[in-house]
Amino acid sequence: MKRNQWSKWIGVASLGLMLSALATPAAQALTVNAFVVKQVCLNGDFVRVTLSATVQPAGPAKYRWDFTNNGTFDTALSSSPTVTHTYPDERRFTARVRVMKANGQVAFDTVTFTTRRCSGGGG
């Protein structure tokens, strides 16, 4: 009889653990959106491009940028989502951002853009 009572308690405890695990929401997937903020002409045929990114869920994150999407990150980890890079004018580029949260979640995004025409220099 005592063995049967222990079996009931173990069964009830197991059921409670399973239900609490099912009720705990999973962490929200990390997403990132990369975009061009602005382009400013420099010295004739070059453009300073400001890139940035937003993440969901919002909160502290670390960012790395690959300015030409060639597989090599050009920046160190930074808490700032915004960077600037100089590109030749009138060319198409794809930049890639990698975002990492403190909990280890990682997300990537790319932004493709054509740099503005800057003949003769100035804004």
Kindly label every feature range from the protein language model.
Residues 2-9:
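Bacterial Sec-dependent N-terminal signal peptides
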Residues 3, 15, 20, 24-123:
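Extracellular/lumenal mature domains of secreted and surface-exposed proteins
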